[in-house]
Amino acid sequence: MKKNRERFSSKEREFVYKFQIGSERLELRVPLRFPVDENASHLHGRLMLLHSLPCFIENDLKEALARFIEEESLRDHDSDAEACLEAVKSGEVDLHQLASTWAKAYAETTLEHARPEEPNWDEDFADVYHDLIHSPASETLLNLEHNYFVSISELIGERDVELKKLRERQGIEMEKVMQELGKSLTDQDVNSLAAQHFESQQDLENKWSNELKQSTAIQKQEYQEWVIKLHQDLKNPNNSSLSEEIKVQPSQFRESADAAGRIYEEQRKLEESFTIHLGAQLKTMHNLRLLRADMLDFCKHKRTQGSGVKLHRLQTALSLYSTSLCGLVLLVDNRINSYSGIKRDFATVCQECTDFHFPRIEEQLEVVQQVALYARTQRRSKCKEARDSGNQNGGSDEKSKNAERNYLNILPGEFYITRHSNLSEIHVAFHLCVDDNVKSGNITARDPAIMGLRNILKVCCTHDITTISIPLLLVHDMSEEMTIPWCLRRAELVFKCVKGFMMEMASWDGGISRTVQFLVPQSISEEMFYQLSNMLPQIFRVSSTLTLTSKH
């Protein structure tokens, strides 16, 4: 049967088409390889173009070609079926095995024989995890997750050491070659060595990438199976080993933590908190925080698990499947990847700990790329239709051409979302596209970055995100042109716009209390921080404090 299929796949037949131009009779002969994988319409178009055929035979040629392909394909299918039957008759194929295969396929594809639809694994696991994290087993879950995190961190450390050694060795080799350049070696030798070094680095990075991917996949499977098993054991009141199973990991972890004796020292953060009221008729109360911190500090796990760190992690886990999610805004460029800048740093943090609930960051970005490509293609086709109908002016034409030219990227003000369960204090990341215009001092409330913030806050209202962290100055790092007046103008603009958006939110969600965290870069001075802190009560209506005194 395989031999017949091989002959069938390599078979060629000649398509003959006769037509007449005036008194001259012509004949077109084209060899076709069967089976024909190409669409008949595409093949017909190629024939018309390649042989410069007249347009009046176009439809007739198309019908003749489609008919020829259909007839010859049916003939090949019939001969292939005959060969299969002969193989069954001759005993080359086991009849009973073939019958069981057909019966299984029929039962799986026919509704009356199909099994009842099983519950979705992800939904089951989410429900089970939500039950366990709100039970006495929560500490066990967190410690197991932390042990997995330490394991991956050690693996990443080994990778970094090996890559560093390779780069140092390659640097020494390149220095020696450069010393001989022009003497015994040429530019071609240098380029050849550089290419070898690049290939060696790529091979080593791919090796470690595959190892990390495999390790995280194993961890995820083990963790999910263990969670399901623990949940089943909790339902069995007669299981005497259950309490020991829950207790063993915390005690082991505390011993290892005490043995390590490491104290995590992070850069001192500046922080101010405010309680504000918005609205005149429908009053809503919200919490605002101004922080001097790195945006990724909300994502990073600590190698040692102090009480404060553990409480943050517990709170994040408790609210993972709740209506009180936490999000942050990352300012990124227009390319949907994790190759540079804060995108690369964020992806590195995500890779340090296995995500047991959602796909890896790379898989989520691949899905976003496909969605963005589809959306941009749809937008491009609509722009083309509008241009063809003559309803667009020159400026719109230029804008649509620009969209066509960059249809694989997103535009300033657009954003994409990734979901995470493996970050310290964050469930959702909004990747907001901005351009170099945010570094200028003349942006307005209609700037794409500002409108992007508005749309992000709207998503927060409709998707149960009650805490959102926003870069106040719309930058993650300070530069020379960002003077004190620049910072004050930018902060005032963002404060006022966010205030307006939060007042809009009252009509979107009914006035749910939310927490908005405004972050400024760590390199900003204390004096500048306190100037921004003094500005906030001038824009938002801060709740007045009430001082209680006792009478003696």
Swiss-Prot record:
Matches recorded under InterPro entries: Fy-3
Record-listed Phosphoserine modification sites: 79
Primary location recorded for the protein, binned into one broad class: cytoplasm
GO BP terms: regulation of mast cell degranulation
UniProt key word NAD: no
UniProt keyword annotations, A-Z: Cytoplasm, Endosome, Phosphoprotein
Cellular compartments annotated: Cytoplasm; Early endosome
Keyword Cytoplasm set for record: yes
Cellular component GO terms, alphabetical: cytoplasm; early endosome; protein-containing complex
Coiled-coil intervals: none
Disulfide bonds: none
Function per UniProt: Component of the FERRY complex (Five-subunit Endosomal Rab5 and RNA/ribosome intermediary). The FERRY complex directly interacts with mRNAs and RAB5A, and functions as a RAB5A effector involved in the localization and the distribution of specific mRNAs most likely by mediating their endosomal transport. The complex recruits mRNAs and ribosomes to early endosomes through direct mRNA-interaction. Plays a role in mast cell degranulation.
Subunit structure: Component of the FERRY complex composed of five subunits, TBCK, PPP1R21, FERRY3, CRYZL1 and GATD1 with a ratio of 1:2:1:2:4, respectively.
Protein name: FERRY endosomal RAB5 effector complex subunit 3
